[in-house]
Amino acid sequence: MMMMFARFILLPLLLMPRASSSRLESQLRDGDVIFHESRSAQSRAIQLATKSRYSHMGIVYRRNGNWFVYEAVQPVKLTPIHEWIERGRDGHFVVKRLRNPAVLTPAVLRQMRAAGEKFRGKPYDLYFEWDDRRIYCSELVWKIYKEAAGIELGSLQELKEFDLSHPAVREKMRERYGSRIPLLEPVISPSAIFESDKLVEIARR
């Protein structure tokens, strides 16, 4: 009797993560954009400066039947999507998709992969510079969409347009730049892409 009860209670619990994963994967499409709250050392400063919960992002691709996130970390790479999700705070994420997904034809998706491939293995850009020597997460997504699809997800801002007043932000700026803060540097933030009217939400946890 106890064995039957244990099976009745425990089996559904063991199957829940698998079922949840399957539901997410059934909703995904190549080229979707995924956001989460990073637990990195700089995440809090990004959130304060941009006034957004979301401090990290990437592009979703399917490879050999499995889903990955193409992301700018150290270095730029493909990460299995469930590893990527669990790396974020509390396993929370939001997936967004182009409002007009028909734009992402097979040819455009091939161009997106090709555009992203030139960044593979490049170091993460701690200084948020707009050149391609190093790359940060939202810069990677923005440049891939711009080059391959001609779409600008969110508007570029100069560094001075962010809220740089919080002590945690000022400390991170001093750590990175010293006294020479590049206030005119063009930047694309995760929040700018998250708020883009070209995207619609399709999943979250």
Label every model-predicted segment.
Residues 1-2, 16:
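Generic N-terminal leader/processing signal
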Residues 3-11:
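Sec-dependent signal peptide recognition
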Residues 16-205:
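Cysteine-nucleophile amide-bond enzymes
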